[in-house]
Amino acid sequence: SPVWKDLYPSARMADGMAAGVNVGMTGIGYNKKMFDEKKWPAPTSWMDFADPKFKGKVVFQSLPASTFGLHGFLMFNRIQGGTDSNVEPGFAKWKSTIGPNVLEYIPSSAKLSEMVQNGEAAIFPLTPTGVATQKARGIPMEYAQPKEGSVLLTVAECVTARNDSPELAQKLAAFLLTPQAQAAALEFGNQIPSNTKTQPSTPAAQATVDRFKEYMKTVKVLDWDAVNQLRPEWNTRWNKTIER
């Protein structure tokens, strides 16, 4: 595709097998209403999940089921001295730090809006786009960029082999990478463009992109080769030792 060269490097998958249609990051979402009422400062670190004041108010996505949960755990693991191929520090420290604060491990983020509205959830892993979507529905959420960095998250597309409309599929895939398509996705869906030439069509959309560029300065990229190889083992261990 001619637009390939215009994509962020992180949106260009190995060997051109796929391309990111939007980019984002997993950081910290929090209950703005609760924080305001209790006069708590906004979160600044992944280690805020271990703050005793959040006991029974942390909601964490399940590592085996959710990329957000995986991202949050791996950042905690890095802070404890681990790497993406060595999660011993994370598993060893979880039960004495974040674990006691967790109200519920959820399989997806679908329950978060209800749990925020009900005053159950104070703090949770989430993306800026996810937070913006909930805010647009009147849910009192805000996003905080952890000082240790957020984790890069890319939604990618590829055309499947031997489909019955290969030319149309390629045209659609190429269109979704254009500045035109991504400007619309940004304006109407808060989707952060992967095409660097996308021009935001409204001041609000421009503000979203400006915030994203700030977040990208400290974003972390996982070693997905190691993660994909080891994740089945982590899933089993998580289910046996964390989420029982």
Locate predicted features.
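Extracytoplasmic ligand-binding site segments that recognize negatively charged/polar headgroups
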Residues: 1-117
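Ligand-binding "clamshell"
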Residues: 10-15, 133-145
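A bilobed periplasmic-binding-protein/Venus flytrap-type ligand-binding module shared by bacterial periplasmic
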Residues: 29-34, 74-79, 154-166, 184-187
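Extracytoplasmic/secreted proteins, especially bacterial periplasmic and envelope-associated proteins
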Residues: 44-45, 71, 75, 86-89, ...
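Periplasmic-binding protein-like
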Residues: 92-98, 105-106, 137-161
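A ligand-binding cleft/hinge motif common to bilobed small-molecule-binding domains
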Residues: 117, 123-140
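Mature extracytoplasmic/periplasmic domains
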Residues: 160-219
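Conserved C-terminal helix/tail region of periplasmic/extracytoplasmic solute-binding proteins
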Residues: 215-244
